[in-house]
């Protein structure tokens, strides 16, 4: 992204970088992370079986396995995002890039990816697992599990971005 001498607002830069992230996602086969999430979801769900929510210990073990899958999927989404573009980011920063805009664009784009992965995880796991019918918080068990999966995947994704920003 070329920044001229005129100052480009942070919001405009976020939009520019969201477009860049989308192009990279499509052209560099970033969509493979969705397939990776689907494969991990299927493997974990097959191993857990349909009795996961029947017995307490199976529920604990299954919950741990599903959340572990969320963490792995989230970290692998973003672990290399920043470090592979380090030279480009430095050059663009000298040309006027606000680092906060760059990070915000990554956070927004990765949130969208994490929403898709949470939906994939819930959809695939529901084919193999029998989720409970009662939902104490929001009245819908699907919504509760979707929010839980999304928050776990997104937290791990942000951790991956932080690691990527630190590593040279």
Named regions from a protein language model:
Residues 1-168:
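Membrane-embedded and extracytoplasmic architecture of multi-pass membrane proteins
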């Amino acid at each position: 992204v070329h920044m001229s001498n005129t100052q480009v607002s942070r919001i405009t830069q976020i939009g520019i970088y969201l477009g860049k992230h989308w192009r990279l996602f499509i052209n560099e086969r970033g969509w493979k992370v969705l397939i990776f999430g689907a494969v991990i979801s299927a493997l974990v769900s097959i191993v857990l079986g349909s009795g996961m929510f029947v017995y307490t210990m199976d529920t604990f073990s299954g919950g741990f396995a599903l959340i572990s899958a969320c963490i792995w999927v989230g970290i692998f989404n973003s672990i290399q995002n920043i470090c592979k573009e380090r030279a480009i980011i430095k050059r663009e920063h000298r040309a006027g890039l606000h680092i906060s805009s760059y990070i915000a664009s990554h956070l927004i784009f990765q949130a969208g990816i994490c929403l898709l992965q949470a939906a994939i995880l819930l959809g695939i796991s529901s084919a193999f697992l029998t989720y409970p019918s009662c939902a104490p918080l929001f009245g819908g068990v699907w919504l509760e599990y979707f929010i839980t999966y999304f928050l776990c995947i997104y937290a791990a994704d942000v951790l991956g971005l932080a690691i990527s920003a630190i590593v040279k």
